[in-house]
Design a protein with these regions (language model features):
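Short, basic/hydrophobic alpha-helical segments
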Residues: 39-63
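Acidic, metal-coordinating catalytic cores used for nucleic-acid/nucleotide bond scission
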Residues: 67-74, 94-96
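A short acidic (Asp/Glu
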Residues: 73-79, 98-103
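An anionic, glycine-rich sequence signature occurring as long contiguous blocks
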Residues: 5-41, 89-93, 98-221
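Short, solvent-exposed helix-loop connector elements
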Residues: 76, 201, 209-216, 231-248
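Short, hydrophobic/amphipathic alpha-helical patches that form generic packing surfaces
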Residues: 250-260
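Short, conserved catalytic/metal-binding motifs centered on acidic residues
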Residues: 1-2, 64-71, 88, 199, ...
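Short, surface-exposed basic-aromatic patches at helix termini and helix-loop junctions that form
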Residues: 57, 76-87
Length: 260
């Protein structure tokens, strides 16, 4: 689903049922529940891009895209947002690799004079990217700061954060040049032995860290929307097995939620 949100209000703007590949290829099951012939298998991040494009085509203004790590770890998803000139703040896994400041891939090998000249950047055993967990875990204590981002039901929401400008490194050995520099943000929750939450962001380099963290944390509104849609508006009460019926049910739940 796609939700439009700010710090004061949020509402789902688009949603689509994810169809597993096994279902997408099974004609009998598709026919039994009325899946349209035009619906093909798409990964969740591809569906997300389609919904973003659809909402933008309706004339809604562009805004930073927020997504959890299920989407943020997909380099193709992040690249597609950049191609659309849409800045993002997306969750990533602790294993995501980046080039820290002052460290970049090696240039292409020198040409031997035979065949096509090498054009891909390189890594070596001594020059390679680092997982974001290792980078954050070994950062000096002075680089971690307590920052507050909103008032919650139990008081001010505050945690310890680390941020740095880095280059994402995923499969860049297949590229001709390094990726652009963007933000890495890490959060070290109280009581945890290591940092546990990480984000990448293409917001401008002069973006205040407080704004970056507010955006990263804005997903709480989306989670709250789902809790209310399920608990108070019956989104998860649909008992049918029809494609159209499910989407009609979901549309009515969301319309009622937006109205109230």
């Amino acid at each position: 689903s796609l939700t439009l949100a700010n710090e004061a209000v949020s509402v789902p703007a688009a949603y689509r049922l994810y169809l597993p590949e096994a279902w997408a290829k099974d004609r009998k099951r598709r026919a039994a529940v009325g899946v349209p012939k035009t619906v093909k298998f798409q990964t969740k991040w591809q569906i997300a891009l389609d919904m973003i494009d659809s909402v933008r085509a309706e004339g809604l203004p562009g805004a930073p895209v927020l997504a959890d790590a299920g989407y943020g770890v997909v380099t193709a998803f992040r690249d597609a947002l950049t191609e659309r000139q849409m800045p993002y703040v997306v969750g990533i896994s602790r294993e995501t690799t980046v080039w820290p400041p002052g460290l970049e891939p090696l240039p292409p090998k020198r040409s031997s004079g035979k065949g096509r000249p090498p054009s891909r950047i390189r890594r070596s055993s001594k020059r390679k990217p680092a997982p974001v967990l290792e980078l954050a875990k070994h950062a000096p204590a002075s680089m971690w700061q307590h920052i507050s981002w909103r008032e919650g039901t139990r008081g001010t929401m505050t945690s310890r954060f680390f941020w740095l400008r880095v280059r994402p490194a995923h499969r860049d050995e297949n590229r001709h040049e390094p990726r652009e520099v963007e933000w890495l943000i890490a959060e070290w929750l109280r009581g945890e032995s290591v940092p546990t939450k990480f984000w990448l962001s293409t917001m401008p380099p002069d973006t205040p860290i407080e704004q970056l963290i507010r955006l990263a944390k804005l997903r709480w509104r989306i989670e709250r929307d789902y809790e209310e849609l399920k608990g108070s508006f019956g989104l998860d009460h649909y008992e049918g097995r029809g494609w159209r019926g499910f989407h009609h049910h979901g549309s009515l739940c969301i319309a009622a939620y937006a109205f109230l």
